[in-house]
Amino acid sequence: MSLGFVLAVTFSIFLGILTYYLWIWTYWMRKGVKGPRGRPFVGVLDVLLEHETPGLIKLGEWTKKYGKVYGYTDGTQRTLVVADPAMVHEIFVKQFDNFYGRKLNPIQGNPEKEQRVHLLAAQGYRWKRLRTISSQSFSNASLKKMKRTVEDSALELLRHIEKQTAGGEQIDMLRFYQEYTMDVIGRFAMGQTDSMMFKNPIVNVVREIFCGSRKNLMLICQVFPPIGQFIRDLTFKFPRIPAFKLYSIMQDVVAARIAQREREKGAESGEPQDFIDLFLDARSDDVDFSAEAREDFSKRNLKITKELSADEVVGQCFLFLIGGFDTTALSLSYVTYLLAVNPKIQEKVIEEIAREFGTSEVEFEKLGRLKYMDCVIKEALRLYPLASISNSRKCMKTTTVNGVKIEAGVYVQMDTWSLHYDPELWGEDVKEFKPERWSTDEPLEHKGAYLPFGLGPRQCIGMRLAIMEQKILLTHLLKNYTFETGNKTRIPLKLVGSATTSPEDVFVHLRPRIW
């Protein structure tokens, strides 16, 4: 083989790769769609992965510049950004069969071929099967059973807060709330029997998933997908990256529970005790997810088998652990901050708690009566949407949405920040913390305008558990304390993050109160 031939082949391969990346980078230019161009190969991915400036806020800035519909490229992905509520509703709900995939980084694996796929990443009939099985965990009956465990963790947190604030110190409530949510979800997703608050080593592993900087790794994986798959395969064997380290821990937890169940011949009570038991009850060695990938998702009345592979059991527990940790802690942190800087609103919440509970026990049935607290939580999530970067979809079949043609393979990213701060949708007081805007029972005029938990069939499955956790803890906290700002309180909050939008800290003073 001559040197000239080798050089010619090498040059042809290089030219082919270069042409491919230039085709992606110029995609929106050729379509006549406005948007930030970024750089060849990378697009705007490096900007979106900056920890110090959340991608959510960058989208808001670009929407002001380019309008409510524009396009960008991030690595090998072509992304259409949408900040129009009618289009959001069309994509998430009316045309769900054309947009049932989700925007993923290649390091998360191929959702159609990968064995280790959880509900967030799954698509098609595999997603439907996982969703059907998982939804049992969040029924009203299941939540009622969970209430006792959630409240036990809430009371344990109050004991730690009492110790830490005995001298009048201000504390970072974000850290305390993370301990609380990990304690709750650790009991449900890891089979933890007792509280491990402030002594659970897994907390730091999970914090690192959300707070650690993995910009270069994520960038390389998304720009060069084959490298992402290679790194994924390698890190499952040698888990060093926090997410894979946590997955490895979860594998050990599930294996231990399987061994326990085999010794005890099943769960003692004959019914699921936690998420692990629920998923293990559905475990089967005969799950064929490759067949699901071949099915036409638009088909109706196709039988959904309620079975999980062993890897899917681990994946579901892993997802529920990370999903239940960060977002609920962040929501509680934002509510606390907003109540501290708005004492009159805080007093209304306290009055409602006194009216509904007084000095009596916090009953599950009465949590639904905390209507004003509902409004406060909703408004906090409007002002500070959390994991809204997850409000994305993959176009599975070329279609037209409100006159905009979207080709198969294009990703759609909803600009939640712009939707939540649009004065045309919310009024000129859009930047104000105004819980009363939620006091009416009438549905929102614009159905795609509010996306704290997503929308449509892929809406966050753990939403009701998250709200219950917040209501129980806030009720106990505000029975005993008043949130006040101090010299360590950042006003306004400094927001950071990429996967989720987090405050750097939420220091407040908790003044004891007599009920």
From Swiss-Prot:
Keyword Oxidoreductase on entry: yes
Binding positions (heme): 460
Keyword Nuclease: no
Signal peptide interval: none
InterPro entries xrefs: Cyt_P450, Cyt_P450_CS, Cyt_P450_E_grp-I, Cyt_P450_sf, Cytochrome_P450_3A
Domain of life: Eukaryota
A Pfam family hit: p450
One MF term in the entry's GO annotations: oxidoreductase activity, acting on paired donors, with incorporation or reduction of molecular oxygen
Cofactor or coenzyme needed: heme
EC numbers on record: 1.14.-.-
Swiss-Prot/TrEMBL keywords: Heme, Iron, Metal-binding, Monooxygenase, Oxidoreductase
Family from the record: Belongs to the cytochrome P450 family.
Function summary: Cytochromes P450 are a group of heme-thiolate monooxygenases. They oxidize a variety of structurally unrelated compounds, including steroids, fatty acids, and xenobiotics.
Protein name: Putative cytochrome P450 CYP13A2
